[in-house]
Amino acid sequence: MEAIKNFFKWLLAFIVFLLLCVGFVLLYSYPQLRDRGFFDYLRHQQNPESVELPTAEELTRCADTPFIMPTAGWVGVLYGDSILGTSNHSGLDIFGLEGNGVTPVYAAYDGYVTRLPEWVSAIIIRHPEDPLQPSRQIWTYYTHMGDQAGYSHIIDQIPPGTVELPVKQGALLGYQGDYNGQSWRPIDTHLHFSIVLDDGNGSFLNETDIANTIDPSPYLGMRLNASCADRPPMCRPDPFCPPLASR
């Protein structure tokens, strides 16, 4: 009996400790989340008329930059962002506000689509010549185009197993969803978009590692790097981060 009492004492102490840790993380993160507009986004989700949320328009381009915006929505998580202690974010998260499977996703640039057989919600496009550095090949990655039950929102013309299907800039690829694989962590409907480096052998590197990806700022003509980003993003003639000394 004494052992059971001790067990519950330790369990209660652990729960209190865990709650304190969560509270500390939330308190530490609050200014970052506020400044990034997350609370406005949450308010908008509850009542769209309560706040005017700045959004990007699909298929638009900043001046003469090579890429178009691949989807519409609130550009909420930027390149290099860190949220609640997670690792640096390797791309952009663009949250559509119309519901699951509704907001279209388009090819940001001409290329060749591949969808691995096991990919439910993702495709990747090979671009033989980087429009900003033509000597190298790059890839653009699009994911979360499916629902939590595993139903894909990718168009039927790009079935699992598709390899090197030619696509033009602005071609429809699918629709935003909230599929997150086997992760315990639920997500809101959005598109994760990133630019991925080639491995030197004609394939793509692991997109989840930010070191294998490219800052999308100059490709879209906006400051999208978390270290100097405009929030909300806007077209700029100077999308690169200024030197640290001048910030």
Feature map (PLM): residue ranges:
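Small beta-barrel nucleic-acid-binding modules, principally OB-folds
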Residues: 84-98, 129-134, 138-145, 155-157, ...
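Active-site loop architecture of trypsin-fold serine endopeptidases
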Residues: 176-190
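Acidic, glycine-rich catalytic/binding loops that coordinate metals and/or anionic ligands
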Residues: 137-138, 157-171, 186-247
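N-terminal Sec-pathway targeting helices
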Residues: 1-20
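Generic domain-boundary/flexible-linker signal
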Residues: 122-124, 134, 181-184, 204
